[in-house]
């Protein structure tokens, strides 16, 4: 079996295709967005490979696995078990970190449990149990002839007169003791003060160091250890200031007796009570009510709403503030910013133990007076948040919560014991906070000796291999402690790719979805090397990809097309790259051979130095106090290697600031910055990302772009509708009236099958048409509402040609290249690139003010060369209306057509975070330090 044979694949828009795919090769599936690549790779090959594997398990085991639908295909032969690595499923678990996903943290736990050296947190002394012979050897290694004495500590820093203890020691035959640092005779001990802390150490032996002492010393040490319960001290008799030797036979600190249980891997897990920090339960952050969120606008007064919910309109809380104002003599009508720091403290944190006279008035106007301390706004919110059972109250209060690093563990997630175990003077949190590249250097140079080297050998190999795979997929800038929630789709996918290589499976079919997303051209070669490595192990690697380098590196290319949606679903060309380039119908072939290409603009829009948006002092994550200057009215690209700080600068700093100031949103805090100027040039900010346009099957392009409302109004205006008294609501499948009630307007009915995937069957009342019979009797230009929803955008544009409002909105959907999707197509079936273009179309169809700031993060994800051309046309159109466009992008075709480029770098992670160069593409291409410049220069020729 050296090939996979597919016969009669009809999944989604595939048109009954037959294919022969070579096994154990690197196969790239390419084609326009929406042409059917994912339908072939994921919904046919992967789904069937996965289903066959799961079918072999028992019915009991199957119910725990999410089964995929059986693809609509006649026959597939030669499949192996399949593993898919997609972008979608990043973990939302706050306990997941890069270290735990890649299993590096598990190996680190093992390493620290087996070769770690525990130390006392207070005295930094290694906790090591010593044998008597080790103690004797240590003493004998001192200079010969040195006068020493051996002491047994009996009492450490305890109050009391201790007369009984001293009498007992004398009766046991001991002659001297050192009491509070002074050696004295036990026959006449000093009188000790009752209220002072004392330390008593018995003198067991006094000697001069010489070689034949070992027998006598061994006996003395045994006596001392028995008397003191495991500790002994050796002091210099001639020099009181000399450092004393401390010995312990217990696994404990010889100074304070701090001891630890035996080291085991779970002690180093922040997901296990044994190792988690008790304050934050191993999350590394604490939630708190943030005064900056509670006081949204310090220029307002308390009466005017400085604290939401405590102003004049909320009678109960406001009368408390008035009583407080009387007591502390401040004015509730004065702006919050003008009140003293003490008043701020009392209002937010309470009056402590000080009683305040509160006047309460009830609904009938009766006043009662009570005296009690004021708990403070923040404490009041915290208490209500903990006590309430209403989810609405909790959601309302959650808006005022921020996270800060846990004070006890300083964000390391581990308890005190785990933080004080060292491998070569480095504790576990220090390794977790290293970037992956730095950690790799650390383990390469780690030299353990003797038995510890043997124990750690295998563990270190596993850690080293996994770090190397992460570096090879371009993730050397991530830290192991980075939370999985904060990873981008491309990063999460490449981490899973690295863990798969770490698993070293053979004979598997891997299906990957655009692994090059979010990856700079520089890191692309390493990623392709990784894919080739997977193939060389003996696996079939199928990649859905548009990247030119990936297509050139493939053993076998499958080009799906010729168009998208209903116009696609056929194999236009397949075989090695030369064969693809020889097929004139293949768009991919034409772009690869250079017959078609995305042109560099003849002239660029010049920047106006008077109109700029200037953000100064951005310091989030790895940004090094940068100043970003964006020309207004231009198409700007933000570039730089992965992890250089592009998303932090734009998505975490610029976008939240603009959203708060322009859109009045009360969303997440922007990353730290000093100042922003130039926002007055804009009236709103819009982020166009690839998140789904709706999460339910009821959401569709028609409802999202606002086409559906005028369509329903047209149907309601038909004479037949008016005579029946139908309103536009009659033609909605979301409300009662016109929809089919058997399936509630879904058109399908979900049947839950245990052990098998849920099946959706067409509703037998409306036959999948979503409306009842009466509604479907109304026709507009000979079509029912169901038939209109079933039209593609192209057909609908022609059909509604005479209705300008509709024609304009549909035209914008065509402008962004979505000719093939259906008006009523469920939002859940759209790809990320399609969802993004539906959003773009909605923006284009609005009557623009020409003062919008658009932010796009990697809009070329999932787009073919021809789709990118269309996207660029749309973005240039938005720019020509006067809008400002900021795009984070790695795709050189987009970068070379930009008016302005801001390049961050030079490296990722701690090696990045600076703006290297900003200017036109021609200026940037000349920058020596920039990695982007190196790849951009040849494109501009």
From Swiss-Prot:
The keyword Cell inner membrane does not apply. Residues 310-587, 607-937 form the ABC transporter domain. SUPFAM superfamilies: P-loop containing nucleoside triphosphate hydrolases. PANTHER family: UVRABC SYSTEM PROTEIN A. This is UvrABC system protein A. Keywords: ATP-binding, Cytoplasm, DNA damage, DNA excision, DNA repair, DNA-binding, Excision nuclease, Metal-binding, Nucleotide-binding, Repeat, SOS response, Zinc, Zinc-finger. Gene3D superfamilies: ABC transporter ATPase domain-like, ABC transporter ATPase like domain, ATP-grasp fold, A domain, P-loop containing nucleotide triphosphate hydrolases. A zinc finger (C4-type) spans 253-280, 740-766. One of its GO terms (cellular component) is cytoplasm. It is found in: Cytoplasm. It comes from Salmonella typhimurium (strain LT2 / SGSC1412 / ATCC 700720). GO terms for biological process: nucleotide-excision repair; SOS response. It comes from the Bacteria. Forms a heterotetramer with UvrB during the search for lesions. Binds about 2 zinc atoms/molecule. ATP binds at residues 31-38, 640-647. Belongs to the ABC transporter superfamily. UvrA family.
């Amino acid at each position: 079996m050296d090939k996979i044979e597919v016969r009669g694949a009809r999944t989604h828009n595939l048109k009954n295709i037959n294919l022969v795919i070579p096994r154990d090769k690197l196969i790239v599936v390419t084609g326009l967005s929406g042409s059917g690549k994912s339908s072939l790779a994921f919904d046919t090959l992967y789904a069937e490979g996965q289903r066959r594997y799961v079918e072999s398990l028992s019915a009991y085991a199957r119910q725990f696995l999410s089964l995929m639908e059986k693809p609509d295909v006649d026959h597939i032969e030669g499949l192996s078990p399949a593993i898919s690595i997609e972008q979608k499923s990043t973990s939302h678990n706050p306990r997941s970190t890069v270290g735990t996903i890649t299993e590096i943290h598990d190996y680190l736990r093992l390493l620290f449990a087996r070769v770690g050296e525990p130390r006392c947190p207070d005295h930094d002394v290694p906790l090591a149990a010593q044998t008597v012979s080790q103690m004797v050897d240590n003493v004998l290694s001192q200079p010969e002839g040195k006068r020493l004495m051996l002491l047994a500590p009996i009492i450490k820093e305890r109050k009391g007169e201790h007369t009984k203890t001293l009498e007992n020691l004398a009766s046991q035959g001991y002659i001297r003791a050192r009491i509070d640092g002074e050696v004295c005779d036990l026959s006449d001990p000093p009188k000790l003060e009752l209220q002072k802390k004392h330390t008593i150490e018995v003198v067991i032996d006094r000697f001069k160091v010489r070689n034949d002492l070992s027998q006598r010393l061994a006996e003395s040490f045994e006596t001392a250890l028995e008397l003191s319960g495991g500790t002994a001290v050796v002091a210099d008799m001639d020099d009181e200031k000399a450092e004393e030797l401390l010995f312990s036979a217990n696994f404990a600190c010889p100074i304070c007796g701090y001891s630890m249980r035996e080291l085991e891997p779970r002690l180093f897990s922040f997901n296990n009570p044994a190792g988690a920090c008790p304050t934050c339960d191993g999350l590394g952050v604490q939630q708190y009510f943030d005064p900056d969120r509670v006081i949204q606008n310090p220029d307002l007064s308390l009466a005017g709403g400085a604290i939401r919910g405590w102003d004049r309109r909320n009678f109960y809380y406001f009368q408390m503030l008035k009583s407080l104002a009387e007591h502390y003599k401040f004015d509730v009508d004065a702006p919050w910013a003008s009140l003293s720091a003490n008043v701020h403290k009392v209002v937010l944190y309470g009056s402590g133990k000080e009683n305040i006279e509160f006047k309460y008035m009830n609904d009938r106007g009766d006043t009662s007076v009570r005296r009690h301390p004021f708990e403070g706004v923040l404490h009041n919110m915290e208490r209500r948040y903990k006590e309430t059972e209403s989810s609405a109250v909790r959601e309302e209060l959650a808006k005022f919560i921020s996270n800060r690093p846990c004070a006890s563990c300083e964000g390391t997630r581990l308890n005190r014991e785990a933080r004080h175990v060292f491998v070569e003077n480095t504790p576990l949190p220090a390794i977790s906070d290293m970037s992956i590249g730095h950690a790799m250097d650390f383990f390469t140079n780690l030299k353990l000796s003797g038995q510890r080297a043997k124990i750690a050998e295998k563990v270190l190999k596993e850690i080293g291999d996994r770090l190397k795979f992460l570096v090879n997929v371009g993730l050397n800038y991530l830290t192991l402690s980075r939370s999985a929630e904060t990873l981008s789709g491309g990063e999460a996918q490449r981490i899973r790719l690295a863990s798969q290589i770490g698993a070293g499976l053979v004979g598997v079919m891997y299906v990957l979805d655009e692994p090059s997303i979010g990856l700079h051209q520089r890191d692309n070669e390493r990623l392709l090397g990784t894919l080739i490595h997977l193939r060389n192990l003996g696996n079939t690697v199928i990649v859905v990809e548009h990247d030119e380098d990936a297509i050139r590196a493939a053993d076998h290319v499958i080009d799906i097309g010729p168009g998208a949606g209903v116009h696609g679903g056929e194999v236009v060309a397949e075989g090695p790259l030369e064969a693809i380039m020889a097929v004139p119908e293949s768009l991919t072939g034409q772009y690869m051979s250079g017959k078609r290409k995305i042109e560099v603009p003849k002239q660029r829009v010049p920047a106006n130095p008077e109109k700029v948006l200037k953000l100064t002092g951005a310091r989030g994550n790895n940004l090094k106090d940068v100043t970003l200057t964006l020309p207004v009215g231009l198409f700007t690209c933000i570039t730089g290697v992965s992890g250089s700080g592009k998303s932090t600068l734009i998505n975490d700093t610029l976008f939240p600031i603009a959203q708060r100031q322009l859109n009045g949103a009360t969303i997440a805090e922007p990353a730290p910055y000093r100042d922003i100027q130039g926002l007055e040039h804009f009236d709103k900010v819009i982020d166009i990302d690839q998140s789904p346009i709706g999460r339910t099957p009821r959401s569709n392009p028609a409802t999202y772009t606002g086409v559906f409302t005028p369509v329903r109004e047209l149907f309601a205006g038909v004479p037949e509708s008016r005579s029946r008294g139908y309103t536009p609501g009659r033609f909605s499948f979301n409300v009662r009236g016109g929809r089919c009630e058997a399936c509630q307007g879904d058109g399908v009915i979900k049947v839950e099958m245990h052990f098998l995937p849920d099946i959706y069957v067409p509703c037998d009342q409306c036959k999948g048409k979503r409306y009842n019979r009466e509604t479907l009797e109304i026709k507009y230009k000979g079509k029912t509402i169901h038939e209109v929803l079933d039209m593609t955008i192209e057909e609908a544009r022609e059909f509604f040609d005479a209705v300008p409002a509709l024609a304009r909105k549909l035209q914008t959907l065509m402008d962004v290249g979505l000719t093939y999707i259906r008006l009523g197509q469920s939002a859940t079936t759209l790809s990320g690139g399609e969802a993004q273009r539906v959003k773009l179309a909605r923006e284009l169809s609005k009557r623009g003010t020409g003062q919008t700031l658009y932010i796009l993060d990697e809009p070329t994800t999932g787009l073919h060369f021809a789709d990118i051309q269309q996207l660029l046309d749309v973005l240039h159109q938005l720019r020509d209306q006067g809008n400002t466009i900021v795009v984070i992008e790695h795709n050189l075709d987009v970068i070379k057509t930009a008016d302005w480029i801001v390049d961050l770098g030079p490296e990722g992670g701690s090696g990045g975070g600076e703006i290297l160069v900003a200017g036109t593409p021609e200026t940037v291409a000349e920058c020596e330090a920039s990695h982007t410049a190196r790849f951009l220069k040849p494109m501009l020729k």
